[in-house]
Amino acid sequence: MSALLNITEPNNNTNSNDNDFLASLTTDAPQAIASKYSREQIAQLFDLPLMDLLLQAQTIHRQNFNANEVQISTLLSIKTGNCPEDCGYCSQSGHHRDKTKLVAEKRIEVDKVIAAAKRAKATGSSRFCMGAAWKHPSAKDMPYVVELVKEVKALGLETCMTLGMLDTDQAAQLADAGLDYYNHNLDTSRSYYEQVVSTRSYDERLDTITNVRNSGINVCSGNIVGMGESRDDRIDWVHELLKMPKAPESIPVNLLVPIQGTPIGDKVLAEGQLSVLEWIRTIAVTRICCPSSYVRLSAGRESLSDAEQALAFMAGANSFFYGDKLLTTGNASQSGDDRLMRELGLTKQFAAPRAPKQVPVIDAMSGHQSQVVLAS
């Protein structure tokens, strides 16, 4: 594993322990140091000058992935609205339906889901994600979702589901069906969580993630940036990922889409939205701390410029949702995504990622030889 570029400079306001940590980014293999990150060290990463942070994140990204290849997923709502949870950002909550005016829909028939999966595969998605607005799937729902997993996998697609909380038996059923990923976001820090949701505890979210992990299904778990939380909350969220026995294989970093009629959406619309650059910082720190995870651009891309999305990829994102809709919110258009990928020189990942190619590079200033990873 290669060493990172040494970008630290003497700073009279930084103590020696801080300098030692930042210097370690230039000498330690990312996988070796990730589990050592303390909360204070994660905070130091957030505080780096943005260009330095992006350089570190992109270098680590290239050590673990093909830098110019992205994984494409498509997301379909298989049961929409009237959710019993009170998530303050979500239009699907039954608690907000009088204000959001979202029309609830029953479960989609299996054949219609399969038709959507076929369309997703034809346009280049390698993973098909299915979401249902439930607190948890009921016993009568399990045969339905198990059938969906089997039918979608038969098309040659990876499968992902987000259905709310799972107990150990439900996780085992989905694992037996062949489910590849299960999404259950932490959303934010433990301390800010009570400002977001009251009908499901933070520990219940962690319990579901544990049940998924123990079943052998890959974990997908991320956050929503821009709900009124502080940077400290974003630091705590990253630290929470590192407390897990293993970091999630897939980490969606959502940028809040404020929906009128939801408590958090109304608050953000009134007070102003978070800087996109802070979202990009969060992506970069996530990439550094979770070097082998896929970091996905999820909600919020529709409002971003090409340059902002390019910075997100520079920060280490290597996956995004493809399609004009994410559950009930808009998404960047497929034609726009195709054009952006062409302009950035990005290609779609259709199979298992190839091993990165390393080449020796001599630092002109020090004469030190290191390895730089090129796209294969």
Swiss-Prot record:
It holds the Pfam family Radical_SAM. The keyword Iron applies. Its EC number is 2.8.1.6. Pathway: Cofactor biosynthesis; biotin biosynthesis; biotin from 7,8-diaminononanoate: step 2/2. The keyword Ion transport does not apply. [4Fe-4S] cluster binds at C83, C87, C90. InterPro entries: Aldolase_TIM (IPR013785), BATS_dom (IPR010722), Biotin_synth/BioAB (IPR002684), Biotin_synthase (IPR024177), Elp3/MiaA/NifB-like_rSAM (IPR006638), rSAM (IPR007197). It catalyses: (4R,5S)-dethiobiotin + (sulfur carrier)-SH + 2 reduced [2Fe-2S]-[ferredoxin] + 2 S-adenosyl-L-methionine = (sulfur carrier)-H + biotin + 2 5'-deoxyadenosine + 2 L-methionine + 2 oxidized [2Fe-2S]-[ferredoxin]. GO terms for biological process: biotin biosynthetic process. Keywords: 2Fe-2S, 4Fe-4S, Biotin biosynthesis, Iron, Iron-sulfur, Metal-binding, S-adenosyl-L-methionine, Transferase. PANTHER family: BIOTIN SYNTHASE, BIOTIN SYNTHASE, MITOCHONDRIAL. This is Biotin synthase. It comes from Psychrobacter cryohalolentis (strain ATCC BAA-1226 / DSM 17306 / VKM B-2378 / K5). The lineage of its organism: Bacteria, Pseudomonadati, Pseudomonadota, Gammaproteobacteria, Moraxellales. The gene is bioB.
